[in-house]
Amino acid sequence: MQLYDMPDKRGHFGPYGGIFVAETLVEALEELRVMYERYRHDPDFLAEFAYDLKHFVGRPSPVYYAERLTQKAGGARIYLKREDLNHTGAHKVNNTIGQALLAKRMGKPRVIAETGAGQHGVATATIAARLGLECVVYMGAEDVKRQAPNVFRMKLLGATVVPVESGSKTLKDALNEAMRDWVTNISNTFYIIGTVAGPHPYPMMVRDFQAVIGTEAKQQMQELIGRQPDAVIACVGGGSNAMGIFYPYIDVEGVRLIGVEAAGHGIDTGRHAAPLTANSPAGVLHGNRTYLMQDENGQIIETHSISAGLDYPGVGPEHAWLKDIKRAEYVAVTDDEAMEAFHTLCRTEGIIPALESSHALAYAMKLAETMSPDQALLVNLSGRGDKDINTVASLAGITL
């Protein structure tokens, strides 16, 4: 079996990825690529990254056998990779630490970020405070409303939060504004992208920093059950938590990789955020080519998901490639199914999951039913649900 080795030198995953940006950004991206190549195997850099993951984030995060959830679903045993236990409450911090350490080495005193659910913004503000960097976070005005607690957290951590009023006022618009800021302040600013999208080298770099999830999980599954799971399941918006757990498994035969997108109100309604499941045509967004929700004129279609972190019209280019080469499968789960899984995990395991992660849980429970008890599923529980209790309460007609 030929070992997986992507992207190519120009940042392409087959026909996806690449660098589609304004001329003004090309030089900055080249500088970033050169610096990342220099440091990605540098022992001092890796030692500092490992130190922060252990002592600041609290890694390794455990793999946990969800016994009562397994009983409720019936069938295969369900294991959870507990990224919700990380400092700041999600997988996002793994990547922000890696990029912030790089920013420091590049002599950039200011970092900027885009955020949807607010988790990446909080993680960026956190590490900026830890390293003494100025921090500005762009967030769609709609998401600012949905995620008020995270907005306040970022401000507590010393970040400036800029609500973006253009377009659909969500993640894609925040990304556009962050890109504009970067072009303007290129000499002193490092752009910390939160997902495996954007122009090369971001999709590769974010994946590499998140791969600690899958690397740990492989070892933990071996210790727990003496083998690897039959399938690894993760939610996919941009897709960094999924890439982080998938990547170390790509060359492992017999392990299915399943990405779960947001079906919103249903794929057939058009009100969703599932470009892979819907087989959306490829297009260019935020500096890379990928599957993209667009109309016949190539205009981006507004997306919908109950979860702010999955509410994105594109997807990381590596996911697009893994779908095409059939190494990963992509499915979608509706708002209602995700909500049901959210409540189920709360009541069976005493864990309040993020609404993003609840999409992966919903599909895992469906799949487990069709399998035998001697089989095992590993779900990436990408984040905790504290940030979502306002959304869940308001759907139940409760004001907090």
Swiss-Prot record:
Belongs to the TrpB family. Gene3D superfamilies: 3.40.50.1100. It comes from the Bacteria. Pathway: Amino-acid biosynthesis; L-tryptophan biosynthesis; L-tryptophan from chorismate: step 5/5. GO terms for molecular function: tryptophan synthase activity. Tetramer of two alpha and two beta chains. It catalyses: (1S,2R)-1-C-(indol-3-yl)glycerol 3-phosphate + L-serine = D-glyceraldehyde 3-phosphate + L-tryptophan + H2O. The lineage of its organism: Bacteria, Pseudomonadati, Pseudomonadota, Betaproteobacteria, Nitrosomonadales. Its cofactor is pyridoxal 5'-phosphate. This is Tryptophan synthase beta chain. The beta subunit is responsible for the synthesis of L-tryptophan from indole and L-serine. Disulfide bonds: none annotated. The keyword Metal-binding does not apply. Keywords: Amino-acid biosynthesis, Aromatic amino acid biosynthesis, Lyase, Pyridoxal phosphate, Tryptophan biosynthesis. InterPro entries: Trp_synth_b_CS (IPR006653), Trp_synth_beta (IPR006654), Trp_synth_beta/beta-like (IPR023026), TrpB-like_PALP (IPR001926), TrpB-like_PALP_sf (IPR036052). GO terms for cellular component: cytoplasm. The modification N6-(pyridoxal phosphate)lysine is found at K92. Its EC number is 4.2.1.20.
